[in-house]
Amino acid sequence: MASILTSRDVKVINFLEDSNIVLNAAQIGKIFYSEQARDDKSSLKIAQKRLKKMIDLKYVKRFRSYSNQQYYYFIGSKVPKLTEHKLLISEFITRMAEDNFELESVKLEWTHFQKDYHLRPDAFISFKYLSHNFYILLECDSSKKFTNEDKYYKLFTDRKNSLEIQEVLPLKRVLIVSLCDVKTETSKITPVWIKNDFSNFSQLKYQFVK
């Protein structure tokens, strides 16, 4: 595999397989091939070329969205259903990569705390920034506002005295991000609010420089 594919190709394959996420060629270019490219157009061309190789070797599959006629790439036995939530998550992590956040892993519909806290964030994102490990609990609410204030408040309150929770969600290393068009107004917790059109995406990086 390594003799035929590049190390970047292997990262693409592993990422798609581990996350069950779908990405288009432009997004894959920005996340995985931007260091080799001059600009977004160049990274897209590189990604398209490498993805063709991965498809020819049957490591990756693709399907076309009838709504926008784009190809989306995935690994799995069934063609995944394209939902607004999944598209928002794919674009969110792409924006992260563009802002020099180093993606480590993405877990969709993360259920680690579902039993005890009735929480299932749309994505649990592990990443590095300035060589430090961080985590995002991502809540996508395309048609409503953030609604899990009390549940997250209990989880983060319990975390203060629970080493078990801290092993999963280290202190001062976790952000709750509310991806929706309605600004979150809470008194107990403070999610980072990102609009669905990503026009205020700079708010994420601001959390690391303020």
Give residue spans per PLM region.
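Conserved catalytic cores of phosphodiester-cleaving nucleases, focusing on short active-site segments
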Residues: 92, 119-160
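Hydrophobic, Leu/Ile/Phe/Ala-enriched alpha-helical segments that form helix-helix packing faces
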Residues: 16, 32, 51-58, 92-100, ...
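Active-site metal-binding core of divalent-cation-utilizing nuclease and nuclease-like domains
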Residues: 81, 98-134, 144
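Nuclease-adjacent, charged terminal/linker segments that flank catalytic cores
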Residues: 1-79
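Short, amphipathic alpha-helical interaction segments positioned at domain boundaries
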Residues: 75-100
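Catalytic cores of nucleic-acid endonucleases
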Residues: 140-191
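Charged, structured surface patches that assemble and position nucleic-acid processing machinery
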Residues: 188-210
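Alpha-helix termini
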Residues: 35-39, 100, 127-130, 158-169
